[in-house]
């Protein structure tokens, strides 16, 4: 049976993040291992959401304990989602170095809203996009990762950028198209 490691928000009463992934993938009989980046009582869009355990929550510690307990492998699909801060991002980066199949869902913002995470974390996503095997980004997120403005990002340019990403993920040996500083966080 296939293992899936999901590293994203755990929202107790809404179907987003780890809850959504478990709902969709659990019915497919995958072994699903959940690592929270943040724990919320409800989606942050609700004004009365409470954040739990934020200070001691370290995805790398949870990952290391899971690896000791369950038969996880470096080629297991690893989903990276909502990342609340740079400390969590750096912990996730260490997990990415150990895992080979990364699905990046860079939960960062939306058209008409802009970024709803801090710029440091958004720029972190720019550095790890080169390490991802797959990406699930909305138009705003994809534009941000490519340093493009959503108002003048043409369909032709979008298709070219998607093609370049595909070439990179199948072993393209050129420089990372997304940012000149792709190794900035990988070296820290």
Residue ranges and their predicted role:
Residues 44-48, 148-149, 179:
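Short secondary-structure transition/capping segments
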């Amino acid at each position: 049976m296939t293992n899936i490691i999901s590293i994203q928000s755990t929202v107790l009463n809404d179907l987003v993040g780890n809850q959504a992934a478990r709902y969709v993938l659990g019915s497919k009989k995958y072994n699903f291992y959940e690592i929270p980046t943040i724990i919320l009582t409800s989606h942050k869009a609700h004004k009365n959401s409470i954040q739990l355990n934020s200070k001691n929550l370290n995805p790398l510690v949870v990952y290391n304990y899971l690896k000791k307990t369950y038969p996880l492998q470096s080629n297991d699909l690893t989903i990276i989602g909502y990342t609340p801060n740079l400390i969590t991002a750096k912990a996730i980066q260490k997990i990415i170095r150990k895992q080979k199949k990364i699905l990046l869902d860079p939960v960062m913002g939306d058209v008409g809203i802009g970024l709803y995470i801090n710029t440091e974390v958004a720029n972190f996503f720019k550095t790890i996009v080169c390490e991802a095997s797959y990406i699930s980004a909305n138009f705003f997120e994809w534009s941000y990762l490519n340093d493009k403005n959503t108002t003048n990002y043409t369909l032709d340019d979008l298709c070219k950028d998607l093609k370049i990403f595909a070439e990179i993920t199948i072993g393209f040996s050129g420089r990372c198209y997304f940012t000149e500083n792709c190794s900035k966080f990988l070296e820290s």
